[in-house]
Amino acid sequence: EATVDMPLD
């Protein structure tokens, strides 16, 4: 689950 807290670069 990608969120702004865990950005997938």
UniProtKB/Swiss-Prot annotation:
Major location (coarse): secreted
GO cellular component: extracellular region
Subcellular location: Secreted, Cell wall
Sorted UniProt keywords: Cell wall, Secreted
Full protein name: 55 kDa cell wall protein
Biological source species: Arabidopsis thaliana
Taxonomic lineage from the root: Eukaryota, Viridiplantae, Streptophyta, Embryophyta, Tracheophyta
